[in-house]
A protein has these predicted regions:
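Ligand-binding loop in jelly-roll beta-barrel domains
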Residues: 69-93, 100
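Generic protein-terminus/edge-of-domain signal
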Residues: 1-64, 69-70, 76-78, 102-104
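Residues that scaffold the ATP/ADP-binding catalytic core of kinase and kinase-like folds
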Residues: 50, 95-97
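Short, Lys/Arg-enriched, Trp-marked, Pro/Gly-tolerant hinge/linker segments that flank
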Residues: 109-121, 134-198
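Short, well-ordered alpha-helical segments
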Residues: 121-128
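Append "Primarily bacterial transcriptional regulators
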Residues: 61, 197-201
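Hydrophobic, helix-rich cores of sensory/ligand-binding and other regulatory modules
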Residues: 65, 129, 143-147
Length: 201
C-alpha cells in the first residue's frame, strides 16, 4: 500500500503539455528510461540515485537532474521519505522551438557542497512553479504563459552544465557494479520482453 499522506500530481500529458510535476512518497521498484528531462528534489528523508555511472544518496533539499534516455532508479532509503519530481518531455515540444536536444543535458547531482549554484537556481524555479500551479483556480485555471516561461528557464539552467570527468562522478554504493551490469543488460535488451530473472543471470 502506497503512502498517500504526501501526494500531488500535475500531469501535463492530460492536455498534451510537456511539463509534469508530482509530489509523493512512493517507493520505486524498477529502473526506468524516459524521453524527458527529470528533476527529482528530496523534500523529506533520503533517496539513492542510481544510473550506470552514479550511485549516490541525496538527502533533504538536494536534487538530481536526470538526462533524457538515462536508465535510472531513485530508491527510497527511509520509510517516510517524500520526493518532488518534474518531467519535461521533449516529445511534446515542437523541434523548431528547441532544435536538437541530443547530448545537451547530462545527469548531475546538486547538493550544498557540489553544484550549489545550480541547486539554488533550480530551487528558485521549483518554488515559482509550485506557486503557479497552486495559485491556479478553477475559474481561470493555470497560467500557461508563466508555466511555459518557468519550464524554458529550467531547461536553460540545466543545459548549461558541463560534463563531469568520469573519475569525479559520485559512486557510493557497494552494489554499484551490480547496478551497472543490470543497467547495461536492460539497455541492450530494452525493446524485448525481459524479466528480473533474466537480469539476475
Amino acid at each position: 500500500m502506497q503512502n498517500m499522506n504526501y501526494y500531488y500530481d500535475f500531469s501535463g500529458q492530460k492536455f498534451n503539455h510537456p511539463l509534469s510535476l508530482s509530489i509523493n512518497s512512493f517507493d520505486r521498484k524498477v529502473f526506468s528510461r524516459q524521453t524527458s528531462l527529470e528533476l527529482s528534489y528530496v523534500l523529506k528523508g533520503s533517496y539513492e540515485v542510481i544510473t550506470e555511472h552514479i550511485s549516490h544518496s541525496l538527502t533533504e533539499q538536494e536534487l538530481a537532474v536526470i538526462a533524457p534516455d538515462e536508465i535510472h532508479i531513485l530508491k527510497k532509503l527511509q520509510p517516510e521519505s517524500v520526493i518532488l519530481t518534474i518531467h519535461i518531455d521533449f516529445e511534446r515540444i515542437p523541434e523548431n522551438m528547441l532544435g536538437s536536444c541530443k547530448n545537451l543535458f547530462h545527469t548531475i547531482l546538486c547538493t550544498p557542497v557540489s553544484n550549489a549554484a545550480l541547486l539554488r537556481s533550480l530551487k528558485e524555479e521549483i518554488r515559482r512553479l509550485l506557486m503557479v500551479l497552486f495559485n491556479g483556480d478553477s475559474a481561470d485555471g493555470t497560467d500557461l504563459f508563466a508555466l511555459n516561461e518557468i519550464m524554458m528557464k529550467i531547461l536553460c539552467i540545466a543545459k548549461k552544465q558541463r560534463n563531469t570527468p568520469f573519475e569525479q562522478l559520485p559512486v557510493d554504493s557497494t552494489h554499484h557494479e551490480n547496478y551497472v551490469r543490470a543497467i547495461q543488460f536492460i539497455d541492450r535488451h530494452y525493446q524485448e520482453d525481459i524479466h528480473l530473472t533474466d537480469i539476475a543471470k
